[in-house]
Amino acid sequence: MATLKQIQFKRSKTAGARPAASVLAEGELAINLKDRTIFTKDDSGNIIDLSISAGGNISGNITQTGDYTQTGKFNLIGPQIVASGGYIEFNYRTTGSGAWSGQHTAKAPIFVDLSSATSTSEYNPIIKQRFKDGTFSLGTLVSEGSLKIHYINESGDSKYWTFRRDGGFTVDGGGLGVSGGSITTSGNIAALGNITSPQINTKNIILDTKAFGQYDSQSLVQYVYPGTGEENGINYLRKVRAKSGGTIYHEIASAQTGKNDEISWWTGNTLTTKLMGLRNDGAMVLRRSLAIGTITADENTNNYGSPTPMGERYIALGDAATGLKYIKQGVYDLVGNWNSVASITPDSFRSTRKALFGRSEDQGGTWTMPGTNAALLSVQTQADVNNAGDGQTHIGYNSGGKMSHYFRGKGQTNINTQKGMEVNPGILKLVTDSNNVQFYANGTVSSIQRIKFDNGLVLTGARPDGIQLDAPTAADGTKTILWAGGTRAGQNKSYVSIKAWGNSFNASGDRARETVFEVGDGQGFHFYSQRVAPAPGSTVGPIQLRVNGGLLTAGSIVASGSITTESSLNVNNGLSVNGQAKFGGTANALRIWNAEYGVIFRRSESNFYIIPTNQNEGESGDIHSSLRPVRIGLNDGAVGLGRDSFIVDQNNALTTINSNSRINANFRMQLGQSTYIDAECTDTVRPAGAGSFVSQNNENVRAPFYMNINRTDTSTYVPILKQRYVQGNSCYSLGTLISTGDFRIHYHEGGDNGSTGPQKADLAWQFRRDGSFRSPNKIEINAVTIGTDGNITGGTGNFANLNTTLNRKTTVGGWAGSSVVGWYKFATVTIPQSTGTVTFKISGGAGFNFKSYNQASIAEIVLRTGNNPKGINAVLWNRSDLSFNQIATMNTSDDTYDVYVFCEGYTNALIVEYSCSENSSVTVVGLNGGIQPVVDALPEGHVVGKTVRLLNNIGGTFAAGESDIVTRGEYVADNQKGMRIKSNGNNIGSNAAILRNDGGSFYILATDKNTAEKSDAANGDWNGLRPFAINMADGRVGMNHGLNITGGGLNVTGGLNVTSGNTSLGNISSRVVARWRGASGWADNSDTMKSKITFMADHGDLSNSDSYYPIVGAYSNYGSAGYRQTFEFGWVGSGTTAGWRDGIIRIRGDNANGQQARWRFTMDGTLDCPGKVLLPQTGAFGVNTSNGLGGNSITFGDSDTGIKQNGDGLLDIYANSVQVFRFQNGDLYSYKNINAPNVYIRSDIRLKSNFKPIENALDKVEKLNGVIYDKAEYIGGEAIETEAGIVAQTLQDVLPEAVRETEDSKGNKILTVSSQAQIALLVEAVKTLSARVKELESKLM
């Protein structure tokens, strides 16, 4: 171990000298002052060199002043930090400099070798820069071997720019913007996103790899028209033609004032003739005609329809002479193979050929029934609200597989044929409501009501038994013929009856009267004739005639012919009806029949039908279950054929086809003027073929216009759309060439080089199956032409003529001035007066001094033709005084000018680049020719140009003078003080505002004002004020001397915390406004809602005692009169250890013992109200339920049971959405049965007056019929129950006071009957019977 003496250094001044081991003890130090080295001896006796030059480890920091030079490798374990203002500089000809071919093996000043990397997913950055919240880096992704510029922010959002090994450059997720020039490439430009440019000049745009949902092109212009300028709101999209001098087609999008937005196509040099338009509501217009499926081998010669049969405006379908043809306004024809087959007019559908309605899937080869409950022909007769069924007339209606016909309407059905009408089989049923009358061919007439003959009854024919009244089989007694009494002149006062009866079959009493013929009236019989039982030994009883009065006769009674009636009337020899024949009470009103088939004229609901019967059911069979050949709507006159497969609606001039349609070969459909085919496509209507791209080749996925090509003749061209221009003897078509499967637009002009004449043109624009497009000639895009030689002309810039652009070069060379300051002749240019431009770029400067950066400058010269007077504008753009400083020009002859520049001495070794417009030329004086001499003086007549200094910081600052500085990029100040703004320069009274960022906070600070004593205060430090600060860690803003907001208010997006004092609104007009917040769901709980409530009072761990905690309120004091009060919102606990708190709304006065009202809201929805609830006006609400009735209603218990006001004075009761009762001013309505223990009707005599007896009560009762019937809730509705009762119309005839008119649930007028009135009628009838019984009893006794 070294002693204290040994710790002292042993010294040596000899270079290279090292102490011997014997000279030093262990740990003793020796120093060589010449070599600056230190030595010691270790415990093994070895001399150790402790200096840095010998290597070793340094565990502390090293601070070095001066240069650092190292010959070997520099291995860096930790980071290397370049302090502010420092940099890493590499001298010229650094490692790796040389040819391209050696760069794979050569290293570089910064070199990373990733050749041994095994993790292919790694990204290896080599340069990285972090700023604010994001980091940029330059590195390599091993899996790609690509060089990437990468950006990632503190949230992990990542973007990158990739330089690929194939020479490509990829931008991830952003755009590639070129603001000062263009992107020029001899190869392809592949863009996965959008390319946005004022103009794109190219050969092909290929979008094969675009993602689903992306557009090929986008032209969403941002035009804004001031004033009324929108009348010219047009976006010009495309202009094309097929050849020079050919038709020019324009495609435009327009949004003009007063018009619908549309896209349209025009012809002409300008927008002269409109061909087609597609409006934003889906409507499409064609100028003339439309041909569909007419393309044949002669292409557009005849494929656009034939004007001979079709006229000028038509829709041709399938062939040139078939389709829809416009005749005149409101009139068009259906044309088939040159012939009109039907005319559609505003008031009719006229068949000009045979009309046949039926259902067939093979064009009439086989006929089938229409669908169940469907008709072949339906007429919309429900327009007159006839309430019969659906109100329509149906012909050929499939009812249960049988063909029926329904004729409906409030009018009448007239049949006016000279030979009358035959119903076969002979069944005719007339139905009205619950009544019906049925007529059978066997003579039977069956009727619910008695048959009434308004104009008498005449029986003709040979049968002697004209009228036969059969004895009832289900009841005692016989039938009576009755003449009712009347009150007019010539009418019988009492009813008169004729009846036949007898008592032979009575159970007891007199049974001798076998046959009695009796004539009587309401006061007794007039006479009767009777045959009594034969006397013993005789078989025929005698005839007795009794007249209850006199018998007067002046002639004879003659009866001829036979009338037989049971339940029908048979007319064997024809029936002649001179007046109107009415059929009512039955749906099947008329039958024409033979033994095999019958046809029935049927009215069903609101339709009239002509329906056949099934085979072999002609006379009495029902309508066919499915066939409905003809239907006429009784309400709208629409005619439906084939179970509405074809419907003609004359009211709306609309023909509806509800089945597949076929136009047979050589026929056509022609569209007339202004007609079109509209393929509907809306959110609810899905057109044929709509779906995915991958489904389009499915033969079952069709389209509004569809052709399925299934041919083997591969040389055939199959067009699907064709247009022929007759005057131009040319045709355009759209179709497929089978041999290639390519879809093409084809143009043919002239004939076939044979019988039709010479061929003039035959061109095809091919959309090929490999995705390519082939044009037969050049492609013109507005003024730009892509020629067949690959050249692009007519564009702007480089694409005015691409070949010329590629042939033109930018010339580069060297230029040198002398050591003398002065003017030099720089160039000679020729610029035509018709406008030309010459540009120069000069790199370099004057002098060669190290770190004189302004000597490495750039100057640019722009020369451009000027007129009036003749000359050129010469502008020199420089960046320092050590470049070209001034410029002058001299016109030497015509359009030739000499150019002079003024520069400093030693302005040499410059690089000059120059170019010119196509019509100009340039010669640089002394280019690559050695040092140029200074000129003695500028020539007389020269013109000094403009010199513009470009703003730069080559001298350390941006010396902009008094110019404004405008930047679109970031303004970065790498200093804590970023900006100082003085109020008045360095003058007295001026002060400054300073923007400062000390890393912890950002401040806006203020200095003191300049004074006479302190004249530089505005340039000094800030004073003690801290008016504004932003905490850089949490973003909080500090206002340390108050905040005055004089306009605009204070908008707070986050929270506003007031830690002390009150927040006061200035006056009564001040208010707190909370702007819109995001919506919250009802499922959000209180913890979620805490962050969503606009005005939030967080009471924290609130006690559940019965203490009251106000949240928000208002205080008012009504002047000197007192009335101090508060209006508050708060809550109160329930007073228990656990439980929900209740919400409180309270209004409180200034009296300690009262003047208080509290409304309490609990968690179960209960409202505890201290007083009554007044609802002056409210909508629907529910009691213990939601409200499903809507309108003005209250529901109870469930959402569709309650009370609803359905109109003025109308209050309805609903049960499960069904209306069961109505209260109104007048009658009360019950739509269901009323069950009650008893019903009491007010009948107090004190309420009654003007008493009158019910006369002839028994006769009135005998005119009534008790019937069993099915009853509906409203007229036209389905029967809902079976009842027994009487018919109101019949009761009205005998006792009008018992019948009252009211409305059903649909508002239809209906008749109701009074049970009380019926009881009164029956009481009087019983009294009459009782009197007669007593009379008979007295006679018998």
Swiss-Prot record:
Major location category of this protein: virion
Maturation and modification: Proteolytic cleavage and release of the chaperone in the host cytosol stabilizes the folded protein.
Record-linked Pfam families: Gp34_trimer, Peptidase_S74
Region (Interaction with the receptor-recognizing protein gp38): 1238-1241
Keywords: Host-virus interaction, Viral attachment to host cell, Viral tail fiber protein, Viral tail protein, Virion, Virus entry into host cell
The UniProt record lists the keyword RNA-binding: no
Site, Cleavage: residue positions: S1243, D1244
Residue ranges of every copy of the Peptidase S74 domain listed in the record: 1243-1340
GO cellular component, one term: virus tail, fiber
Gene Ontology biological process: symbiont entry into host cell; virion attachment to host cell
Subcellular location field: Virion
Oligomeric and partner information: Homotrimer. Interacts with the receptor-recognizing protein Gp38.
Family: Belongs to the S16-like long tail fiber protein Gp37 family.
Name this polypeptide is given: Long tail fiber protein Gp37
Native organism taxonomy: Viruses, Duplodnaviria, Heunggongvirae, Uroviricota, Caudoviricetes
